[in-house]
Amino acid sequence: MAKKSLIEKANRPPAFRVRQYNRCKLCGRPRAYMRKFGVCRICFRSLCYRGQIPGVRKASW
């Protein structure tokens, strides 16, 4: 879990637009963010395994 202070800081509008960065909507993690889904890779993986993201399934080839 990310620090509460950093999550709140990311929610505030920055003084300059280039300082804005994405955070996971579930856990607040700033790294490995997937724009299309709005979550980090760890939360994405757990949501996929539970079948909560429609159209996503495990690859096999």
From Swiss-Prot:
Recorded GO CC terms: cytoplasm; small ribosomal subunit
GO biological process: translation
Record key words, sorted: Metal-binding, Ribonucleoprotein, Ribosomal protein, RNA-binding, rRNA-binding, Zinc
Cofactor mode of binding and number, as noted: Binds 1 zinc ion per subunit.
Example of a GO MF term: zinc ion binding
A Pfam family per the record: Ribosomal_S14
Superkingdom of this protein's organism: Bacteria
Swiss-Prot/TrEMBL cofactor(s): Zn(2+)
UniProt-annotated binding residues for Zn(2+): 24, 27, 40, 43
Family named by the database record: Belongs to the universal ribosomal protein uS14 family. Zinc-binding uS14 subfamily.
General function of this protein: Binds 16S rRNA, required for the assembly of 30S particles and may also be responsible for determining the conformation of the 16S rRNA at the A site.
Alphabetized NCBIfam families for the sequence: PRK08061.1
Quaternary context: Part of the 30S ribosomal subunit. Contacts proteins S3 and S10.
Name assigned to this protein: Small ribosomal subunit protein uS14
Species of the source: Desulforudis audaxviator (strain MP104C)
Gene name of the encoded protein: rpsZ
